[in-house]
Swiss-Prot record:
Pfam families: PdxJ. Pathway: Cofactor biosynthesis; pyridoxine 5'-phosphate biosynthesis; pyridoxine 5'-phosphate from D-erythrose 4-phosphate: step 5/5. This is Pyridoxine 5'-phosphate synthase. The lineage of its organism: Bacteria, Pseudomonadati, Pseudomonadota, Gammaproteobacteria, Vibrionales. It comes from Photobacterium profundum (strain SS9). One of its GO terms (molecular function) is pyridoxine 5'-phosphate synthase activity.
């Protein structure tokens, strides 16, 4: 079975920095440490309210990341313009609400088809690979195909938040089915949201998955074990699931 890649989301390094309005800890430094520890890519979410990652971070990270930069962003003219100026390797289009603590669900691609298709086309024409962050739903996968996006990222939050083993298994089966369906259509499949050291293995074991994007649990463990070890330990969990 092929190995699975780890994209490390470093948003919450910026959250910690912004809590005191200081210049540290710097997400640029975090990206370097994460890459040395085995991260296959670095993910950042430039939110419209700039609550963690800011424009300066995006600009410098694009110049310094040694692996691949994945820029998460809302489908707005401002964000598309920033992406076209920055030219990260990947853009993941996500839904965004100012009042949410974190992204609460997948993008309604089917309900915003023309808007998302237009953004996808602009980014693709600039040589940027586009992923759409969606729930594990066939209608949304079909809409992704219609948009021309080569990647989806399946939302694993419902799986991560399930309160019983039965509910978690049901969510895992939905994700597995969606991954198989998307893969069959020629779409590459990533996944992420709410994944931890305790729940990542069943997701990582799904053979169609190309990459997992994980942030909060890694940054949280880094507070106790250091970022290098936190990233390396997550990579071990994921690769063990593929053996």
């Amino acid at each position: 079975m092929n190995n699975i890649l780890l994209g490390v989301n470093i948003d919450h390094i910026a959250t910690l920095r912004n809590a005191r309005g200081t210049r540290y800890p710097d997400p640029v430094h975090a990206a370097e440490v994460a890459e040395r520890a085995g991260a296959d890519g670095i993910t950042v979410h430039l939110r419209e309210d700039r609550r963690h990652i800011n424009d300066r971070d995006v600009r410098i990270l694009k110049e310094t990341i040694q692996t691949r930069m994945n820029l998460e962003m809302a489908v707005t003219d401002e964000m598309v313009s920033i992406a076209l100026d920055t030219k990260p390797e990947f853009v993941c289009l996500v839904p965004e609400k100012r009042e949410e603590l974190t992204t609460e669900g997948g993008l309604d691609v089917a309900g915003q088809l023309e808007k998302i298709k237009a953004a996808t086309q602009k980014l693709t024409d600039a040589g940027i690979k586009v992923s759409l962050f969606i729930d594990a739903d066939r209608a949304q996968i079909d809409a992704t195909l219609a948009c021309g996006a080569p990647f989806v990222e399946l939302h694993t939050g419902h799986y991560a938040d399930a309160e019983t083993e039965e509910a978690q298994q049901a969510e895992l089966e939905k994700i597995a089915s969606a991954a198989t369906y998307a893969h069959g259509l020629g779409i590459k499949v990533n996944a992420g949201h709410g994944l931890t050291y305790h729940n990542v293995k069943p997701i990582a074991a799904l053979p169609e998955l190309y990459e997992l994007n994980i942030g909060h649990s890694i940054i949280s463990r880094a507070a106790f074990d250091g970022l290098n070890k936190a990233v390396a330990d997550m990579k071990v969990e994921m690769l063990d699931a593929r053996r």
